[in-house]
Swiss-Prot record:
The gene is truD. It is an enzyme of class 5 (isomerase). Gene3D superfamilies: TruD, catalytic domain, TruD, insertion domain. One of its GO terms (biological process) is tRNA pseudouridine synthesis. Keywords: Isomerase, tRNA processing. This is tRNA pseudouridine synthase D. It comes from Yersinia pseudotuberculosis serotype IB (strain PB1/+). Its EC number is 5.4.99.27. CDD domains: PseudoU_synth_EcTruD. Responsible for synthesis of pseudouridine from uracil-13 in transfer RNAs. One of its GO terms (molecular function) is tRNA pseudouridine(13) synthase activity. One of its GO terms (cellular component) is cytosol. It holds the Pfam family TruD. Belongs to the pseudouridine synthase TruD family. It catalyses: uridine(13) in tRNA = pseudouridine(13) in tRNA.
Length: 349
């Protein structure tokens, strides 16, 4: 998916700059959203890593603890080209914990280990805290104005380009699969391609809403989500005025679909809008239905929390903020500046 074709909330930036000139310019700290139990058959291990991807570290931990790889889990994938603090979970029923003081892997440091009663699963995170350094910024004034706009109105909650694979290959392969031009047997590839398909359709609908100034305008039949919650409800015609006030106040979010094998969830005017946006995606929709992927919805807009900016000089900005799990830091940066160097790597979940 070409991110350049997606609508900006605050207009295309005039400033350009570089993100991730080095791994230390992109720091991610996982926020579990709960305190480990301190007891149980699972061991949660928090590791700071630099230059290692998530699965590589998980596999290494499994070998170190003499466990089957399936007994080591994590809540989300993180990029290797960054400094990340991430939790891993070792399933140790009736077993002593390995001596992590002897754990050695280049680029990795064990920060803590604590027992827990439940397995850490994909999506278990509450969110992630980011600290980014943006370098060689060409227009400080424009960036400062955009930071104020983002703090007040947020950014489009787009899936970043990394969701679609390098050069958008996951989406390319998904379309070939949908058209029966290739067979996809490997489970992980099937998952990547289906995820890319659904994410692309979410981005497409969200972009159309922004282009028509509908990102915060409630349509009859819209699916609305309480801020910070995953559940949603449908806007009825006789409630539009009240619901519009709640959206404007930030209590409710307008959502767009991650299509699945069920209905989109909207009705009336909103359903017609979404169906029109997806009119040319029939092959991908058929693939998703055939594979029986469960549908869901996601807020169209994203408001970074606890956003703090610190200018080191006129061309270098340190920016920190918190995002809920599944949201992309690069979607925040996209509204701030154009990147001089394309980088398809980022936090994935």
């Amino acid at each position: 998916m070409d991110m350049e074709n997606l609508t900006w909330l605050h207009g295309k930036p005039t400033a350009s700059g570089i993100l991730k000139a080095n791994p230390e310019d992109f720091v991610v700290v996982e926020d579990l959203g709960f305190e480990p139990d301190g007891e149980g058959e699972h061991l949660l291990v928090r590791i700071r890593k630099n230059g290692c991807n998530t699965q590589f570290v998980a596999d290494y931990l499994a070998r170190f603890a003499k466990l089957h790889p399936r007994l080591v889990s994590y809540a989300g994938l993180k990029d290797r080209h960054a400094v990340t603090e991430q939790w891993f979970c070792l399933h140790l029923p009736g077993k002593e914990a390995p001596d992590l003081a002897t754990f050695e892997l280049e680029g990795c440091e064990v920060l803590e280990a604590v027992r827990h009663k439940r397995k850490l699963r994909i999506g278990s995170l509450k969110g992630n805290a980011f600290t980014l350094v943006l370098r060689h910024i060409t227009d400080r004034q424009d960036v400062e104005q955009r930071l104020q706009q983002i703090a007040a109105q947020g950014v489009p909650n787009y899936f970043g380009s990394q969701r679609f694979g390098r050069g958008g290959n996951n989406l390319v392969q998904a379309r070939l699969w949908a058209n029966n031009e290739i067979r996809v047997k490997e489970r992980s590839k099937r998952s990547f391609y289906l995820s890319a398909s659904r994410s692309a359709m979410f981005n497409l609908i969200s972009s159309h809403r922004l282009a028509q100034q509908l990102s915060t305008t409630v349509l009859e039949g819209d699916a609305l989500q309480l801020s910070g919650r995953g559940s949603w409800f449908v806007a009825q015609a006789d409630e539009l005025a009240t619901l519009q006030q709640r959206v404007t106040a930030g209590e409710l979010n307008i959502t767009a679909p991650l299509p699945g094998d069920s209905e989109l969830g909207t009705h009336g005017e909103a359903l017609a809008f979404e169906q029109a946006c997806l009119a040319e995606q029939t092959e991908l929709l058929s693939l998703i239905k055939h594979e029986r992927v469960e549908g869901s919805r996601r807020a169209v807009l994203l408001k970074p929390q606890n956003m703090i900016s610190n200018w080191w000089d006129d061309v270098t900005l340190e920016l920190s903020f918190w995002l809920p799990a599944g949201s992309f830091a690069t979607s925040v940066v996209r509204e701030i500046m154009n990147q001089d160097r394309a980088d398809d790597t980022d936090i994935i979940e």
